[in-house]
Amino acid sequence: MATASNLGYPRIGAHRELKRAVEGYWKGDLTKDELRDSAQALRESHWATQQELGLDVVPSNDFSYYDQVLDACAMVGAVPERFPWDGTEVDLDTYFAMARGLQEKDLEGEESGVQAMEMTKWFDTNYHYIVPEFSHDTTFSLSSTKVIDEYEEAKAQGVDTRPVVIGPVSFLLLGKTQADDLDALDLLDDLLPVYAEVLQELADAGCEAVQLDEPNLVLDLSDAERAALDQAYEALADAADIELHVATYFGGLEDNLPTALDLPIDVLHLDLTRGEEQLDEALDHGVPDDLALSLGVIDGRNVWRADLDALLGTVETAIDALGTDRVLVGPSCSLLHVPVDLDTEPGLSDEMKTWFAFATQKIEEIVALAERADGHEDATEALFEKSRRAHAARAESDWINDAAVQDRVAGIDASMTERDSPHSSRSPLQREALDLPTLPTTTIGSFPQTDDMRRMRAQYKKDEISKDEYEDFIEEQIADTIAAQEEIGLDVLVHGEPERGDMVEHFGRQLDGFLFTENGWVQSYGTRCVRPPIIAGDVSRPEPMTTRWLSYANDQTDTPVKGMLTGPVTMLQWSFVRDDQSRAETCRQIALAIRDEVLDLEDVGIQAIQIDEPAFREGLPLREHQWDDYLDWAVECFRLASSGVRDETQIHTHMCYSEFNDIIEAIADMDADVISVEASRSKMELLDSFDAFDYPNEIGPGVYDIHSPRVPSVEEMEELIRTALDALEPSQMWVNPDCGLKTRRWVEVQPSLENMVQAAENVRERATA
């Protein structure tokens, strides 16, 4: 019979129980034992839920207090030397220190602090993992038995699970080496014995199969990296009497498919949502007789109810070729990336609820597909019929389908993505209109969010205060922020965004086509959870979104005020996106809505408008040969949003990451008049790519690190400005912080900005002398 399996379940709990427990421990409100009890209760609940839903293969060790890659670091003893660890078991405090760093008070005065390990995006998802660190001195030993302990814990509960572990090759490739002459794969020989020991201990505990995640198989790999996979699994296949199930996800294997199919393993998992063609490719290549395929047919990264009839055809294709005993049915990836349970959503209409499937509902779909493939039509027909009705309803829904929006997208032409004149002609007009000096100063948008702001927004949402009371408060905050900036001496001001919480949610709630959940939480990193909006229908803007507050801000000053908007690509990337049309089409709809807002801001006298695109690079496909298509439509959408204005109106954008070399041409094609970037920590190194490319427009490299509470001195910011001027012309450069100031306090922000303005004035005097 076909096997219903799962690769991973959300660990946070349906109501973010894990977040509260871990943060309670960090604050000292919970003891270690109380934290462990809370975690065990969550695990037991998750295993019971999945077993009751009918899964044949339930995962364990998918739970984590913080991150699964950090768990693997603890398992193999990959603890950087700067952390106080005695080389035995990695305890809970060492584990959290690796993720969060140590402050002086944690170290009893022995040191001033220990920096946390780096965190970065998990492939092209919105989850973040802790980056392993490797050096010539790195050694490995079994230093955490969590994977074995949790297998035994589940077994005691009556659930025989399949433990999940990051595979050894991906573990090394996901890390960073601390020496230029060290290749992470040089450590494979030392790492494999620890993995072999884990497999043997699992086998001794009665475990029959282990899931080894090798997501790097969907990336562009070198011959040496493919050889490392062969070496690793040849060794692990002989390590213990246990089945090896290798999971790949987030894309197709493409040229790595032969390597994966030839590994000495028992099951290979294929993502058939982002690599739907690879089942046919695998069957055409030839699947070894002793290899079963796990079919990732249920989308583990989106929230839509599956088309079960269509997916059944895929499952039956595999069964016809391999037989039912060699086919597993599962999600495309771990269900970590979707909310826990649709039944916790009281705010969605009954009709809308039928459109979606969260983790619990996705497991129901997996089980139904496996059972239907085994001929159990009567038992599964209700869910299949629910799937049919949902897809038919979406196709016919007036809420989803807006002919006016579709017609407008169809009418987009090249002229809508071009400014009237090139930047070289626009720039002098803008400098005159805005009365800008050399090296103008500004900020990125947000100012400190106080407890009062958060409280007033919450009270207004709950109807505890009137609209007039709320708006009076917001006006007061804006006026204070404008006055503070004038006192500091900034050249272009912002209104401070006191009315905004999340930068995507704020706009999404004002756009038709977006839906929001109450409990649709997913883990971003550690205890940080987010509720991504759902782009469910055609997107349009029923009325202006920001002109009310920007007009008020503009009336408070004679200094230019910059409008702040979230860009279409970022709105797309940080949402669950509809699956019934291309992402490019949805992005164009958002871009048209933002375009309308840009033009309205211009009409009310805002002459500088910033369209933030922090997620622009995140949208890059994992395979380089797919980049051009994405960059073509992503750049088009930014230009569609920004190109309707007059030459005198200055368009800014902001990107907060430091790798531009491989997309610098696309950034130039966006044709923003000014791009501000995070640069202070890298000491302006990222400007090398702008300099080498001869970037034509204006740049604001950050000179104030807003991620730290310290106040940078005038002298150090002067030095950064002068360093930047080695790569940029004075007429090309702006002076600004790295990012928005929302998370900082006024006592830090005020003196930091005063020093920044003074530094700019000092360098300006010399540059213009």
Curated annotation (Swiss-Prot):
Catalytic activity of the protein = 5-methyltetrahydropteroyltri-L-glutamate + L-homocysteine = tetrahydropteroyltri-L-glutamate + L-methionine
EC number of this enzyme: 2.1.1.14
* Protein origin, superkingdom: Bacteria
Tell me one GO biological process term: methylation
Metabolic or biological pathway, per its Swiss-Prot or TrEMBL entry: Amino-acid biosynthesis; L-methionine biosynthesis via de novo pathway; L-methionine from L-homocysteine (MetE route): step 1/1
Cofactor field = Zn(2+)
Q: Does the keyword Lipid metabolism apply?
A: no
Give the record's cofactor note, including how many are bound: Binds 1 zinc ion per subunit.
The entry's keywords: Amino-acid biosynthesis, Metal-binding, Methionine biosynthesis, Methyltransferase, Repeat, Transferase, Zinc
Q: Where is this region: Disordered?
A: 415-450
Any idea which positions bind L-homocysteine? Answer: I444, G445, S446, E497, D612
Q: Which residues bind L-methionine per the record?
A: I444, G445, S446, E497, D612
In this chain, composition skew of type Polar residues spans 439-449
Gene Ontology MF: a single term: zinc ion binding
Record flagged with keyword Lipoprotein: no
Q: Which residues bind 5-methyltetrahydropteroyltri-L-glutamate?
A: R16, E17, L18, K19, K121, R528, C529, W574, E618
Query: Which amino acids does the record list as binding Zn(2+)?
Result: H654, C656, E678, C739
Q: Which residues form the active site?
A: H707 (proton donor)
Q: What does this protein do?
A: Catalyzes the transfer of a methyl group from 5-methyltetrahydrofolate to homocysteine resulting in methionine formation.
Q: Supply the PANTHER family for this chain.
A: 5-METHYLTETRAHYDROPTEROYLTRIGLUTAMATE--HOMOCYSTEINE METHYLTRANSFERASE
Regarding protein family, the annotation reads: Belongs to the vitamin-B12 independent methionine synthase family.
Protein's name according to its UniProt entry: 5-methyltetrahydropteroyltriglutamate--homocysteine methyltransferase
The gene name reads metE
